[in-house]
Each structure stands twice: as C-alpha cells, then as structure tokens.
From Swiss-Prot:
Top-level EC class as recorded in UniProt: ligase
EC number in record: 6.1.1.19
Identification of the protein by name: Arginine--tRNA ligase
Superkingdom classification of source: Archaea
C-alpha cells in the first residue's frame, strides 16, 4: 500500500511542478492513528521550487490525490502543510487478514531472488566450550541466515574450522600430556586439556618450541596430502571438540550447512598459489617475513603473508578461504567480533587487489554478564551450556510458580523453549554494534522486554482459540468479517500484523535481525492491549466475535513466523 501511495504521490507532484520528480519519498507514521496512518512532509520540500507556502501546496496535492481514489485509502487530509492518509480498515482488514489466514507460515516470504548467499558465523577455535561471547556471533548469524533465506535467497551457513593455529597445536600437545576426561561433554573436556597445557607452557617456556614444531609438521603433512599419526591427532582433537559444539548449537536451534577446514586450502595448494599471486603484484616486501603493502587501500599496517621458511599464516589461509567462498556465491556475509575489524579490512583489501568480490561484514561488540567478561585462555569463562542451564532452571521455577502444568515432562519441554527464547532473544534484540551485559531480569522478563512476553502472547492466543473450539456457534463466512466500525486497538493490531512482509525485507536488506526482534515484541504488546480492550466471547454481535477471533488466529501465525526467523519456538502454554 505504501508503495502505491508514493507512486501516485510522485505522479501528482510531477503534474503540479510540470517537471520529473526523481527524489525518494518516505511516508511517516503519525504518533496517533487518529491523525492518520501515513503522513508526508513533501509540501515543505516543494515550497522553494513552487514559491508557495507548504499549506497551499498540501491543499493542492491533497485535491489531486483525492481524485485518484487510491485503493485502500478512505480519506486524505491536508493539516498544517502535512498530507495525512487514512486507511479504509474494513477493506484493508478483509484482504490483508484473509491473506495471512490462507498463506500461514508462507506469509511474508519473499519471491525467489536467484542469488546464493554464504553466511559464515560462529567459527570458534575448537579448543574449549563455546562461551557467552561466541553466542552473540552464532545467534546473530543464525537469525540472519533464517531471515535472508525467508526473504527469497538461497543461503548456506558455513563454519570455518581453524585446525592449523597455535591454539589447536596446544590442544594436541596437551592430549599427549594429560588424560582426556571422556565423562565430560567433548568440548569441555578439550577445554580442560587446553587450560592445563597452557599452564604447563607458562611454567616451562622452553616447551614453546614443541608447539612451533607441531604447527610446522602439520602444515607440511597437509601440503603433501599425507595422513599420519600427527594429522590423525589433529583431526581427532578438532572433531572431538566440534561434536560438543554441534550439541551446544543444536540445543539453541543453530545449524551449519558446511564445515570448511582451514587445512583444506593448504592441501589443495591454494594457499601457496595465493602467496605467489600476491608476490606477483609487486606489493610484497621481504624482511624477517613476507609482508603485503595495502597502503593504496588506506591501510597503513602491512599484512604478514608468510614466514621465510615458507609456512603460511592464518591471514593467508583466510584469504584462500574467502576466494573460494566468493567464487561460490553472489553475496558473502561474515559475522565477526569488533576486534577483527582491521583483519577483515586487510583480507577484503587483498581480495580487491586480486580482483575478487568482498563479503559484507556484520561486526558485533563484546557481551558479558554483570560479574565480568570471559576468557577461554584463562579457563575462567561462562559457557553457552551453563548459560542455557541457568535459563532453563529459572524458567522451570517460573512455570511452577504460575501453576500452568504439573507434568514434569511438559514442564521441561516448555522450560526448554523459554530458555532458548530467553538466551536467543535477549542477545539478538540488541544491535550487534553495541556492547551488552546479559541480564537475567531482561532475558526472562514476562512483562516488558523478554522473549517470554512474546511467547506468552502466543500462548494466550492458543487459549482463546481452544475456547473457540468449545463454542457451539458456527463461524460466519470469511467474506462477511469486519463489517462494523473497528476501534483503535483493532486497527493498530491489523496494521502491525500486515507489516510483517516489509519487516522481513527490511531486516534482510539491512542485515539487521534486531529489526525482526523489535517487531515481534511490538506485535505481542499490541496484541496484549487488543486483548485487554476488545472482549471476544462477551460480544453479542456475531460479526465482531468472529472478526476478533480471526485477528487472534492471525496474531498467532505472525508471532510464530517472526520467532521462527529468530530460531525461537512458541509453547502452546506457559
């Protein structure tokens, strides 16, 4: 509807100005629905061109617009230079709500774009459990994957496995020194070995040479495509940790389509090819290492490509990975911590130097609990597993307090959905570029800002619809719905429900899943006000009863659709 209004508005501006108007027109929403559903200040922008007051221009444009009989618009008013549009809610409700009812979980889905997107997210080093800091990467990445896919793109989620770095060499070194606790979850067991190995290295600095030897031997074996005792140790250590990661991520409804190992680019010769190609650009300098000059891209620091002994570095392997990735997609998206900004700029500059497309990067700031931040290296961190368990335990207490159910299995099932929702939503609702403190009062808030607010609105819809099923009255024909004067709460709910397709598009285009998170909460809060002010079964008018029930059904659908795009399930009761 908005696009139709702006198209007609441009047409009328061109009639009035007798020129082609090619500027963007944005419709705003007035602070109150009583002032209109959409508004534009275009008259103020045209005042200088037409040498008239905005009030006069608004009146002239309004008269021209009224003559068009814009579909779905009941009234157009000029007020103090602004042009306000009022929706015909009886007509708008019939068509819009019918569309949600018929399309259900497909409502809002974008048309196929015939473009492939590769989103790389999580990609934590396999040297210990995923901690709360990793959760922001994984949750933002997975939510974005779901939204972009729903918007019509073919999307592949990748995990880039760092199996060649110093940290993994320390794990392999540690496995030779310490026994792996197989009673622990795999990633936690690996983390314990890594922590002990680090302590040993701190006490015996001369052992650092062993780590360098392990790294060099593993790379040499990879270059030759050899499988030996050492490569088997690395593979075992990495896969063992990854099995724990997958369990953690699966618990949060996060899945990757492909795990790409860093060493694969050494094995296939691509890393050496990248080094040589970059040398051929004449931008590489040699001192104690090989360095790439990226000053033409405004980067003063030189990128270290390789050691003089020929062994590669993470940066070179990262460039090889990105070349491969960008060759196999139309759009690449990386989710990275803000501390990786310079590295990302250097990799992208290297790709440009070689003539390749570059990925878009969504950076996120650090996340912490009120007690402080986390570090895998020190062995003092809060794992995602611990975060989830704490959320679930708190959810169980809340469910029992509300006496919604006494069945232990059902309590656990509902608590799991609330816990996942609490963790995922509390993280995704905050813009990634803002540092955040994870607070339990927000995450498990049933009243204002938490996922439980949205899930509870869904559960309320379910209860209302269960009551409908016990009602003996048969519903009227769908074409006869909304044949009465709708109140403000009904209008606001209809309006926000029908915004869903636009929110999907906006979230996907901006690469901002927090837009969807904010919208889902807005829907829940708008529905709660509707529920408080629009009685259903007490109404005698059959048209009102079934029109309002249809709104409840559609609210349930939209909440399910929105939360699904954030990886959150909706309990039928809470």
């Amino acid at each position: 509807m908005e696009q139709n209004i702006t198209n007609i508005l441009i047409k009328k501006i061109e009639e009035l100005t007798e020129t082609i108007y090619d500027e963007t027109i944005r419709l705003e929403e007035p602070p109150s629905i009583s002032l209109g559903d959409y508004s534009t200040n275009i008259s103020f922008k045209l005042a200088k061109l037409l040498k008239k007051s905005p009030m006069v221009i608004a009146e002239e444009l309004t008269n021209l617009l009224i003559s068009e009989n814009i579909e779905g618009i009941k009234e157009i008013k000029a007020v103090n230079g602004y042009i306000n549009f009022f929706i015909d809610y009886n007509l708008y409700s019939k068509s819009g709500i019918a569309k949600i009812s018929s399309e259900k979980d497909k409502f809002g889905q974008g048309a196929p774009k015939n473009k492939k997107v590769i989103i790389e997210h999580t990609s934590a080093n396999p040297n210990g459990p995923l901690h709360i800091g990793h959760s922001r990467n994984a949750i933002v990445g997975d939510s974005l994957k779901r939204i972009v896919e729903f918007a019509g793109y073919v999307v592949e989620a990748q995990y880039y496995v760092n199996d060649m770095g110093r940290q993994e060499a320390i794990v392999v070194y540690g496995l030779d020194k310490f026994e792996l606790n197989e009673q622990q979850k795999p990633d936690h067991a690996i983390g314990e070995v890594y922590f002990k190995a680090n302590q040993l290295l701190n006490e015996n600095p001369e052992q650092e040479e062993e780590i360098l030897k392990l790294m060099k031997k593993y790379e040499e074996a990879s270059e030759k495509g050899e499988e030996n005792e050492l490569t088997n140790k690395f593979n075992y250590a990495v896969n063992y940790a990854l099995s724990g990661f997958k369990e953690t991520l699966n618990n949060l409804n996060i899945h990757h389509d492909k795990f790409v190992w860093e060493s694969s680019y050494v094995k296939n010769g691509m890393v050496q090819k990248v080094i040589q190609t970059l040398k051929d650009t004449g931008k590489v300098e040699k001192d104690e290492v090989y360095r790439l000059d990226l000053s033409e891209f405004g980067i003063d620091k030189k990128l270290v490509l390789a050691r003089l002994n020929g062994t590669s570095l993470y940066s070179t392997r990262d460039i090889a990975y990105h070349i491969d990735k960008m060759k196999n997609c139309d759009i690449g998206i990386n989710i990275l911590g803000a501390d990786h900004k310079l590295t990302a700029e250097m990799v992208n500059a290297s790709l440009k130097l070689l003539g390749y497309n570059t990925p878009e990067v969504v950076f996120y700031e650090f996340i912490s609990l009120p007690e402080g931040s986390m570090s895998t290296r020190r062995g003092t961190f809060i794992s995602i597993d611990e975060l989830y368990e704490e959320a679930k335990n708190r959810a169980v207490k809340e469910i029992k307090k509300r006496n919604e159910t006494t069945e232990e299995e059902e309590i656990n099932n509902i608590a799991h959905k609330i816990a996942v929702g609490a963790v995922r939503y509390n993280i995704v609702r905050i813009s990634p570029d803002k540092a955040m403190v994870f607070r339990w009062d927000d995450a498990l808030d049933f009243e204002k800002v938490g996922a439980p607010v949205i899930q509870y609105a869904h559960a309320r819809c379910c209860r209302i619809l269960e009551k409908e099923n016990t009602n003996e009255n048969k519903p009227i024909d769908a074409t006869e719905l909304f044949e009465y004067d709708l109140n403000e709460h009904e209008k606001l709910l209809i309006k926000i429900l029908l915004k869903f397709p636009k929110i999907v598009e906006k979230s996907a285009d901006a690469k901002k899943p927090q837009i969807m998170a904010t919208y889902a909460l807005d829907v829940a809060q708008t529905f709660n006000r509707y529920y408080a002010n629009c009685p259903i079964f007490k109404e005698e008018n059959k048209n009102i009863v079934y029109s309002r029930l249809e709104l409840v059904k559609c609210t349930k659908t939209i909440i399910e659709n929105a939360l699904n795009l954030l990886g959150i399930e909706c309990p039928g009761k809470m």
